From Swiss-Prot:
Pathway: Cell wall biogenesis; peptidoglycan biosynthesis. This is D-alanine--D-alanine ligase. GO terms for cellular component: cytosol. It is an enzyme of class 6 (ligase). The keyword Thylakoid does not apply.
């Protein structure tokens, strides 16, 4: 039976627009290679109908919740439809920055110092519309301030289960923390407050068992946020990254160890920070990286000799 591939895109997460761009690029790349690929927007399509519609494989181009977090992967496994990328557990863990950090720490891998906060546990009576100064009027906040003081300023506040830098804020003064937490809470009940590292942001693409050339990211703004990732033409990317050979080897080993620690499979991208003292810190793993014209995975693949069409065909060949 000829192969019929559903490229799952769009969805309902905050990363919907990025996913639409990624998915349509993937469809074009697969069709260029002669593969019967169809765009399927999961916002308007029941995934459980894929089998009866004759689809034999699924290329997951969804980003964020309900596409990258293990839910979709579980449905596809139930349907016995091979799909691209990591399995249920690895997808769920990678989507959850807090739990992935815990696993990295358990594996002896370096992560940035952080505090994990649950809104209901820390401030059970607070809503997003609360106008009180939380840091001054809530008795639990004293414990929070103590923990944060141990991290030191500046900080980065982010939702634990969100992508594309949605809900992230750099905090340079303690009085900015309240608004930063509320912004993050808009996206998730669990928030990470991390130590801010001055240094270089790097990303490492992994394709099958191969570590592709690393990319160094240079932003003109405060940090590598949504604007810098998908809109700005001022963000600069260097591939290869220009690291010393020994650092490049160290980065590749760290990235693969992190990838394996979560049980990732097929393809993925590992984000790493190199601080000014030469120390690497794992940030997160993306199990369904972006494939837009601003995306980093295709850039690393080009450096390794893959055309875009060859890349998406290789990813599809790794479906399980």
């Amino acid at each position: 039976m000829p192969e019929k591939v559903a490229v799952l895109l769009g969805g309902t997460s905050s990363e919907r627009q990025i996913s639409l761009q990624s998915g349509h690029a993937v469809v074009a790349g697969l069709r260029e290679a002669g593969i019967d690929a169809r765009p399927i927007d999961t916002k308007n399509f029941l995934v459980t109908e894929l089998k009866e519609k004759g689809f034999t494989k699924a290329f997951i181009a969804l980003h964020g919740r309900d596409g990258e977090d293990g839910h979709l992967q579980a449905v596809l496994e139930f349907l016995k439809i091979p799909y691209t990328g990591s399995g249920v557990m690895a997808s769920a863990l990678a989507m959850d920055k807090h739990r992935s950090k815990m696993i990295f720490q358990g594996a002896g891998l370096p992560v940035s110092p952080y505090v994990a906060l649950n809104r209901e546990q820390i401030w059970p009576n607070v809503t997003q519309n609360t106008s009180n100064d939380l840091l001054l009027n809530n008795r639990i906040s004293n414990k929070l301030i103590k923990n944060i003081n141990q991290l030191g300023l500046p900080l980065i506040v982010k939702p634990s289960r969100e992508g594309s830098s949605f809900g992230m804020t750099k905090v340079e003064h303690l009085d900015q923390l309240d608004d930063a937490l509320k912004k993050a809470w808009h996206y998730d009940e669990e928030i990470l407050v991390e130590k801010w590292h001055f240094g270089t942001e790097l990303t490492v693409a992994i394709l099958g068992d191969t570590v592709l050339p690393s990319i160094r990211i240079q932003v003109s703004d405060i940090f590598y946020d949504y604007q810098a990732k998908y809109v700005s033409d001022k963000t600069q990317y260097f591939c290869p990254s220009g690291l010393k050979q020994e650092q490049e080897k160290q980065l590749a080993t760290l990235s693969m160890n992190a990838y394996r620690a979560l049980g990732c499979d097929g393809w993925g991208r590992v984000d790493v920070m190199l601080d000014d003292e030469g120390h690497f810190y794992l940030m997160e793993i993306n199990t369904a990286p972006g494939m837009t014209d601003h995306s980093l995975f295709p850039m690393a693949a080009r450096q390794a000799g893959f055309s875009f069409s060859e890349l998406v065909c290789k990813i599809l060949s790794l479906a399980h």
